[in-house]
Structures are given as structure tokens and as C-alpha cells.
């Protein structure tokens, strides 16, 4: 094929020699390989009979810009001279190849406007790779301080906005193949280098694409095939069968595959998995039956031109999987989902494996991938070059002999939000994140622990509450109301270490993470000696790193944050890690004192916080009805929400965690069995249980007065309140009473005596009835507090929406606001519109980058910012029930939810409305064992999987029918 292409290019000599020439402008940073590529391109054009002038940037500087320096201004002037010279030479009818840095948008735009035959080729190389090569020693001199004004280091490099061709040179560039791609630009009608142009191989049907790639691949191989159309089969199936059987492999096990014209991007859509493939077929009769099955799967949208192809079955498989060469949002990542356990080729595509792995790697850092995946990435890079497409979906398999097979390749079916020229911004942003991780991981004089790690789920789990890519307004409000200061004030009040002035949550370019070292410090009881505190924090961090699936269960499985009846047994684990009996006694005593202070008597801390929440409910009408402007009303709603809402809520949330841990300890020491523990949880009277009852009993108007402020996304201005879109959430014609009465829980006399005895033995200063009251009130109080404070927050969001509308901003615009803008407007006299518009513009720009960033759920080192495996997740199974039902997602029409297992992104209590829709069960991507929705599921008796994690959530959501087996704690894909 390459020979034919070169013959085609040789026909360029027939062109009119007097026609204007073309300019091939090869640009990139110093050391990218521009000169090498330019010389080879010049030689090939010259061999084709073209008149060629090759201009190298260093030579040009010596001839026409000798007096200029290397400042940004001088470099711009030099680049413009190069551009004008190229224009002049091209007017004479010859082609010009110019290899130059010249990374200025101004120059690139001038070239496009003034040079008719302009072709822009961008050689893209990451800085780390350039520093490694450094053939001219430039980067080494910069590092020593002997050089300055180097583009990409201390001078900005303006990557081309719309290059005709991007060539990624991460290692040894295949110069010949690169020149083929450049020459192919000349053959395209408009010369445009869009993502799918200038390809050596064009995407066709699945079978045709594989057939075209087979003789060209160097880093993989393609299984042989027999291909035929539907009309071929219907015309003479005997002849087709004879061809299959006559193949050298035809009498062995084969796979019969679809190759429809409407799949794999042939018609602009992938239709992945829509049509059948039949594996492991042997013999003429079985093959004929399999072919009929595949044709039948084309159904009504098939045609006689659709194809079927048969290949030998790949039986001895060491690894198989799927690679995306872009993230779903268009970010520059390789995403490899693979199975190296089952020995089968279809576990990933079927979503049926329990041991599937997912690896993500920034495309500019291929060296960071494990050796077992290096050859897979090499194959994908080669396919990107051959297909001239940097967004592809590749299925592969590795035989047990180490041979790599390409099973399928198609354009990646994603909706582009940002152009690929933002890849450099992504790389720069991730470099900044890695640097921040390194800085925050250093020892700190006011923190215990020798290292830091970061997670999306521990402690105040932002992934559950605001999401992993929250809108700027959501992120800034969560910081304002919880994670900047409130969290630390309340934890200090409850007897833990004083972490005031430490933000709990950091933002990595808009991705929220908990600083886990700060969090673990805050759970050390006040009074614990510094040496013991430091060793405890290090132990907690090491434990989380060794068992990352516990990241949403740290308070139950890793740290010791309160005294429970099973604490001595739980502490035996740390005794195995160098903690002495004296250490255990000191920690145990501190936890006992802290717990007694929180739960004891009428002066218990949780009682005071419960009273403050009621005060917020009383103050809300005062702010609502005050004769103050909208900005002031927003400001005071948030201020009151902090002081009388989230501050006591943080305390009640702490009490709620302690309550659940105490209840679990009843089960662990044998006072209650697991069924009795579940019955207690089902007997708790929370907002979640009352909302279903009130929906059946109250009028629509009264129901919305009580619950109308709730939103599925508590901090999300784009999430309508219940009273803004009631018919979206509720089926008012089907308001039926709860199917069963609330559970009744009672302790036997013997159980009461046993608990009383244990309380005395463990020196907990509370009687059994008061303890039961605390556990019940702790769980209920946490839910009630959130219900109350979210009313103030929801009102503030509605007012922000109104404020935006008054100044020409849509509600979508308002999502990009930072709450700092409201605070500025309250305390300063600036133009309201200008402040809002500027904040929206900044937020929109930042969030565009945030959408393209992917980070692991736990970051333990700077290197993990660029390449990582998604850790296995250990979901939380709620109830001991089982259910088998079809699947639905929260974005589907609500009327379709009844009788289905519903997929919900987070465990936010604003999703309470789903419980009025008759769902059979639900699964959340994020959320912990003690999350709001876990409590809802427990009290309502609905089977649920809370915190499935990204990989399993996406896999299960893609199924048609699931079984949630909460008894055995497993999820089965039924269809």
C-alpha cells in the first residue's frame, strides 16, 4: 500500500511548475525533531520532481536575523521574517519546507491568511522527553542557570490553534511514516488536517479495516478472515461455507462476527455491542447457524451489503481488553480496561468479569505504563498514525506466547468538548498538580505524619457530595460551608486535635480531594502524646495505601475515632505494628474521655448542636423577609447557614458516626445479631422514612412546603428544587402508602442487662437507656440537621440564579460563578455585572480544563498524577435482601423506574424522591457505609450497593438486568 501511495505522490511532478508553491511549516519546541523531519520531507518532494527550498530555523537566524536576540519580542520578529521569506519563495512556484520553533499564534494566523498553500505540521513532544534528549544542551544550561529565554521554559509556547497535522514524537519517530502523512495532506481536497484526514488507512467496516491494517502493522498482528456480505450468503451459502472450511483454520474452532455498514464508525456511530458475535463454533452446520444468528441481529436496520466475517478462535489468551486513546471527555489519555485472569477475550466487552483492571496513562507519559501493557500502547500509537486519528477504540488480545493481536479498531464515539490542541494545557495542569502533591507531602511543623496522601472519599467525601468534577459554584460553596474552616472548628470542639486554619479539601485544578494526612490528624484525641500521634497517623496512612478499597470506610475500618465496646479487639491489630501496651492504654483512655464528653447526659455536646439547628430554622424567615438587597440576603443566608447550620451539623454528623459504630459494636460483641442490628436501623425515624409517608398522606402543596427545598444535588444550582420541577420527580397520581409499617425494635431484659454490664466494664459514663436514646438520636439528628441547613443553602442558590438573570446570566452561567464574587459584591462597591461576568468567565475557562483531567481516587505520589491503575473497590451492601430486576439510570424518564434497579451517581440525600417511584433497588458510584442514602436504604428495607466505584458502576450500569445479592455481597450480571 505504501508503494502505491508513493507512486501517487510521484505524480506531483505533473503539476504546473508555474503554479504557486506550498509551504510546509514544521513547528515545535527545540529538540522536537523538526530538522530531521524537514530534511526527509524535502528529499521525498525533490524525488517527486518538485522544486524544493529547505529552511532550517538555526540557518535562517544566522542569515536574516543575526542581530536579533532570543527575547519573546525578538523571536516574534524573527518568525515573521521567516514567514515572509516562505511567502516570497512559494510565489516563485517552488515548495518550501521550513523547520522553525516560531510558536506564536500571531505568526501562524498570518501564514494562513497570506500563504495559499500553507500546511502547518506540529511536532508535539513533552518537556520531560525534550530534557532527556537535549541534543543541543539547551535544557541542561537552563537548569544550571546558564541560559534564559528558552521557549517552553521561561518563554510561553503558543501551540498551534488548528494545525493541519499533529505528530506526537514521544520516542523514536517513524520519520518515513510521518512524511507519508504529510504528503497525504496534499491529496486531500482541502488540505485540512482534521483528526480523521491524511490517513494511510481509512476507517471502513470492522472486517475491511482489519484487512487493510493487517499488512502494515509492525507492533501487532491481525487474525486471518473470510469475509462475505449478507447477499453473498443468501445467494449461495454453500459456496461461502466451502470458503470458510477450506481456510487452513476452517476446521478448528472459529468466531463468527458482525461487520455491518452501520457499526464501528462507518456511519458516524459505533453501535458497539449491538450486533451478535458467536464464539467457539466448530463444523459446517454450527457455522451456518452462527452466521444466520449474526444476520438476524442486524434486524430492521440491516442491509444486503452488511458483512459477516469468520476468523480462527483465539483460545490461548494471557490478556485481553479494550483501549481508548482519549478519555470520554476528550482528554489526552490512554485508558486500558483489561482482563488478565480469565483466559477469555470477551470479559471486558461483556462487562462480565470480577477481576477486570483499568489503567490510565497520560499520552505524553507512555514510559509510566507497566511493562505488560507497553506493547499494547505501542500498537495503539501505530494505529493512530496509520489511521491519522488520535481518538480510537481498540480491542486487543495477547496470546499465551506473548503475541499481540488486534481484534477491532474504530473511531472513539465521544462528543468533543475541547479541541486536541488543549492537550498541552492538560499536561501543564497535571505537572502543576504533581508539584502541589509533592509540596503538600513534605513534613509540616503543625502536622503529625511523615507523608501526605489525597482521596476523593475519606472524611467529608467530596465525590459523594459535590462530585469529582463539580461546578465552580458548588466547589466554592462546599469550601465555604464545610471544608475550609467549619470542619476543623467542630472537630476541635468535640475533643480532637486542633486543626483550625488547615483546609481539609484541596482543589487540583477543580478536582476536589481530601488531604488525608490533615484528616487523620484531626481524628487523634486531644491529649495523646505527640510521638504516639505521629505513629498513629503514619499507621493510618500506610493501612489505607495497603487497602485502598477502604477509602470510603476509614472511620469504620482504619482509624480509632471513638470508644466502642469492641475497641480492645480492634486495637489488637495495631499491637502487631509496634504499638506498645502503654500506647494502647493511652489511646484507649483518650478515646473513652472523648466519647463520654460527647454522649453523656444533658450536657452532651450533641444536644447543644441539636438546639442550634432549631435556631437556624427560626432565623431563616428573618433573613427571607428582611428589607435588604439580594446580594445581602444571599450573604446572610450563607453566614447563618455556617454558624447555625453546617457548624452544628458537623457535630451531629460526628455524633451520628459514633452512634453507628457503637451499634455495630453491639453486634461485634454478640449482644445483638446482625438481623437485630438491621432492625434497629430500620426503626430509626429520619427524613428518608418520613418523606415516603408524607408523599402518600399530604396534599401536593403541603408536601412541597415541607420538602420543596430539596435538590438531588445539594450544592448544584443546575439541579432543580423539588418545588421548581415537582412533576419531574414525583408521580402524583400514584401516591400510595408505605408498603409496610415501620420496623419495631426492642431489647430483651437480658440484652439490657448485658449492655449495662459492658458499659460499666468499659467505664462509659452512660446508662443503657440513655445510650440507646443517643444512638437513635445521633442517627436521626444528623439527617434532620442536613434537612434543615440545606433549606438555607437551597434558598441562596435560588437567589443566585435570580441575581444572574437580572444581569443577563443564565442559570448555566451561574454554575461557573465562585462564591467569592458574592462576598466581594457584599463588601465592595464594584459593578455587579462586571464582577459576575468576570467570575463566570474565569470559572468557565477553568472548568473546561477540569473536564479533561483524570486523576486516581487516591493520590499517594506525584507520579500517580500521570499514570495509575484504578484501585479495586469494595462496595457497601445494604440490607440482607436479594433482588433481580432490569436496570435504569437516574437520567431516564422517572416513570420507568418502578420495579428496576436504579443507578444514581452519588449518595446525596437530595435523591430521596426516587423512593416514591417504586424502585426495587439502587446502586451509587460514590458513598460510604454511613452515607445518607445507606441509612435511607436500611430504614426502608431497599437492597442497595453504595459506593461501587467508577469501574464497577460503569460496568454494571451497562447491563440490562442485574441481581443484587446483598446476603452474599455480590452483584451478578444477568443480561
Give the role of each language-model region:
Residues 1-23:
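Extreme N-terminal, non-catalytic leader segments
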Residues 34:
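Conserved lysine of the Walker
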Residues 127, 132-183, 188:
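Small-molecule kinase domains that catalyze NTP-dependent phosphoryl transfer to phosphate-bearing small molecules
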Residues 39-84:
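Conserved substrate/cofactor phosphate-moiety recognition/catalytic segment
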Residues 192-220, 229-234, 267-268, 287-293, ...:
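Conserved divalent-metal-coordinating catalytic cores
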Residues 99, 114-133, 167:
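Conserved phosphate-donor/acceptor-positioning beta-strand/loop module used by diverse small-molecule
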Residues 26:
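Hydrophobic anchor at the beta1->P-loop junction of P-loop NTPases
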Amino acid at each position: 500500500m505504501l508503494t502505491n501511495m508513493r507512486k501517487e505522490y510521484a505524480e506531483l511532478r505533473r503539476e504546473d511548475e508555474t503554479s504557486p508553491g506550498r509551504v510546509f511549516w514544521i513547528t515545535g519546541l527545540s529538540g522536537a525533531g523538526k530538522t530531521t523531519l524537514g530534511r526527509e520531507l524535502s528529499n521525498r518532494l525533490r524525488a517527486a520532481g518538485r522544486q524544493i527550498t529547505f529552511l532550517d530555523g538555526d540557518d535562517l537566524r544566522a542569515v536574516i536575523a543575526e542581530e536579533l536576540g532570543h527575547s519573546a519580542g525578538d523571536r516574534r520578529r524573527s518568525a515573521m521574517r521567516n514567514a515572509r521569506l516562505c511567502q516570497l519563495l512559494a510565489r516563485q512556484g517552488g515548495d518550501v519546507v521550513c523547520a522553525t520553533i516560531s510558536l506564536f499564534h500571531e505568526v501562524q494566523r498570518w501564514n494562513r491568511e497570506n500563504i495559499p498553500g500553507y500546511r502547518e505540521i506540529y511536532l508535539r513532544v513533552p518537556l520531560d522527553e525534550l530534557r532527556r534528549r537535549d541534543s543541543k544542551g539547551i535544557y541542561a544550561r537552563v537548569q544550571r542557570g546558564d541560559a534564559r529565554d528558552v521557549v517552553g521554559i521561561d518563554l510561553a509556547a503558543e501551540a498551534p490553534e488548528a494545525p493541519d497535522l499533529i505528530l506526537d514524537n514521544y520516542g523514536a519517530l517513524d520519520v518515513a511514516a510521518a512524511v507519508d502523512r504529510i504528503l497525504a495532506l496534499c491529496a486531500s481536497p482541502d488540505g485540512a488536517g482534521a483528526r480523521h484526514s491524511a490517513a494511510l488507512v481509512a476507517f471502513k467496516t470492522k472486517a475491511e479495516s482489519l484487512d487493510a491494517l493487517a499488512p502494515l502493522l509492525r507492533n501487532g498482528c491481525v487474525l486471518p478472515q473470510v469475509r462475505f456480505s449478507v447477499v453473498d450468503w443468501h445467494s449461495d451459502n454453500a459456496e461461502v461455507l466451502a470458503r470458510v472450511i477450506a481456510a487452513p483454520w476452517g476446521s478448528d474452532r472459529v468466531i463468527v462476527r458482525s461487520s455491518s455498514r452501520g457499526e464501528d464508525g462507518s456511519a458516524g456511530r459505533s453501535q458497539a455491542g449491538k450486533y451478535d458475535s458467536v464464539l467457539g463454533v466448530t463444523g459446517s452446520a454450527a457455522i451456518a447457524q452462527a452466521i444466520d444468528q449474526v444476520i438476524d441481529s442486524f434486524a430492521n436496520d440491516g442491509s444486503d451489503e452488511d458483512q459477516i466475517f469468520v476468523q480462527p478462535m483465539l483460545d490461548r489468551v494471557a490478556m485481553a481488553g479494550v483501549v481508548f486513546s482519549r478519555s470520554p471527555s476528550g482528554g489526552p489519555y490512554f485508558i486500558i480496561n483489561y482482563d488478565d485472569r480469565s483466559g477469555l477475550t470477551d470479559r471486558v466487552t461483556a462487562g462480565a468479569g470480577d477481576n477486570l483492571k483499568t489503567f490510565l496513562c497520560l499520552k505524553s507519559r507512555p514510559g509510566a505504563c507497566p511493562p505488560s501493557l507497553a506493547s499494547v500502547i505501542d500498537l495503539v500509537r501505530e494505529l493512530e498514525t496509520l489511521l491519522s486519528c488520535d481518538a480510537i477504540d481498540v480491542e486487543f488480545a495477547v496470546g499465551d506466547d506473548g503475541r499481540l493481536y488486534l481484534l477491532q479498531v474504530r473511531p472513539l464515539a465521544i462528543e468533543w468538548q475541547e479541541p486536541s490542541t488543549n492537550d498541552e494545557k492538560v499536561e501543564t495542569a497535571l505537572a502543576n498538580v504533581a508539584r502541589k502533591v509533592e509540596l503538600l507531602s513534605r513534613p509540616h511543623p503543625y502536622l503529625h505524619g511523615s507523608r501526605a496522601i489525597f482521596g476523593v472519599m475519606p472524611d467529608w467525601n467530596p465525590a459523594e457530595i459535590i462530585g469529582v468534577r463539580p461546578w465552580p459554584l458548588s466547589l466554592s460553596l462546599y469550601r465555604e460551608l464545610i471544608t475550609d474552616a467549619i470542619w476543623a472548628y467542630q472537630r476541635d470542639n468535640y475533643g480532637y486535635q486542633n486543626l483550625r486554619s488547615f483546609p481539609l479539601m484541596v482543589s487540583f485544578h477543580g478536582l476536589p480531594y481530601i488531604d488525608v494526612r490533615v484528616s487523620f490528624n484531626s481524628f487523634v484525641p486531644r491529649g495523646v502524646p505527640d510521638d504516639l500521634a505521629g505513629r498513629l497517623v503514619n499507621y493510618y496512612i500506610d493501612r489505607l495505601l495497603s487497602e485502598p478499597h477502604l477509602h470510603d470506610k476509614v472511620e469504620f475500618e482504619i482509624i480509632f475515632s471513638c470508644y466502642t465496646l469492641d475497641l480492645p479487639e480492634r486495637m489488637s491489630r495495631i499491637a502487631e505494628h509496634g504499638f506498645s501496651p502503654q500506647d494502647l492504654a493511652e489511646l484507649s483512655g483518650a478515646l473513652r474521655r472523648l466519647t463520654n464528653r460527647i454522649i453523656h447526659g444533658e450536657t452532651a455536646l450533641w444536644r447543644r448542636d441539636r438546639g442550634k439547628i432549631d435556631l437556624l430554622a427560626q432565623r431563616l424567615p428573618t433573613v427571607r423577609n428582611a428589607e435588604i438587597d439580594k446580594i445581602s440576603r444571599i450573604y446572610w443566608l450563607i453566614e447563618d447557614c455556617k454558624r447555625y447550620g453546617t457548624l452544628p451539623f458537623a457535630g451531629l454528623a460526628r455524633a451520628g458516626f459514633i452512634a453507628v459504630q457503637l451499634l455495630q459494636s453491639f453486634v461485634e460483641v454478640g449482644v445483638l445479631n446482625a438481623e437485630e442490628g438491621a432492625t434497629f436501623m430500620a426503626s430509626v425515624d429520619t427524613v428518608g422514612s418520613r418523606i415516603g409517608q408524607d408523599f402518600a398522606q399530604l396534599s401536593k402543596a403541603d408536601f412541597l412546603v415541607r420538602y420543596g427545598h430539596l435538590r438531588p444535588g445539594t450544592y448544584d444550582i443546575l439541579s432543580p428544587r423539588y418545588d421548581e420541577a415537582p412533576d419531574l420527580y414525583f408521580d402524583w397520581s400514584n401516591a400510595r402508602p408505605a408498603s409496610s409499617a415501620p420496623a419495631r425494635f426492642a431489647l430483651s431484659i437480658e440484652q439490657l442487662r448485658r449492655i449495662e454490664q459492658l458499659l460499666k466494664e468499659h467505664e462509659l459514663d452512660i446508662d443503657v437507656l440513655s445510650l440507646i436514646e443517643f444512638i437513635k438520636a445521633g442517627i436521626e439528628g444528623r439527617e434532620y440537621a442536613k434537612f434543615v441547613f440545606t433549606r438555607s443553602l437551597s434558598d441562596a442558590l435560588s437567589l443566585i440564579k435570580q441575581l444572574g438573570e437580572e444581569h443577563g446570566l443564565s442559570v448555566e452561567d451561574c454554575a461557573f460563578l465562585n462564591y467569592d464574587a458574592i462576598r466581594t459584591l457584599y463588601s465592595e462597591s464594584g459593578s455587579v455585572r462586571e464582577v459576575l461576568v468576570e467570575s463566570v468567565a474565569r470559572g468557565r475557562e477553568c472548568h473546561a480544563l477540569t473536564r479533561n483531567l483524570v486523576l486516581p481516587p487516591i493520590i499517594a505520589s506525584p507520579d500517580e498524577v500521570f499514570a495509575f491503575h484504578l484501585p479495586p473497590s469494595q462496595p457497601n451492601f445494604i440490607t440482607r435482601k436479594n433482588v433481580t430486576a432490569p436496570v435504569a439510570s437516574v437520567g431516564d424518564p422517572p416513570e420507568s423506574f418502578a420495579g428496576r434497579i436504579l443507578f444514581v451517581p452519588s449518595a446525596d440525600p437530595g435523591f430521596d424522591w426516587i423512593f416514591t417511584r417504586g424502585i426495587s433497588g439502587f446502586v451509587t458510584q460514590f458513598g460510604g457505609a454511613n452515607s445518607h442514602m445507606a441509612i435511607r436504604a436500611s430504614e426502608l428495607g431497599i437492597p442497595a450497593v453504595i459506593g461501587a466505584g467508577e469501574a464497577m458502576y460503569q460496568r454494571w450500569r451497562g447491563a440490562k438486568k442485574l441481581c443484587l445479592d446483598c446476603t452474599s455481597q455480590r452483584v451478578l450480571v444477568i443480561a
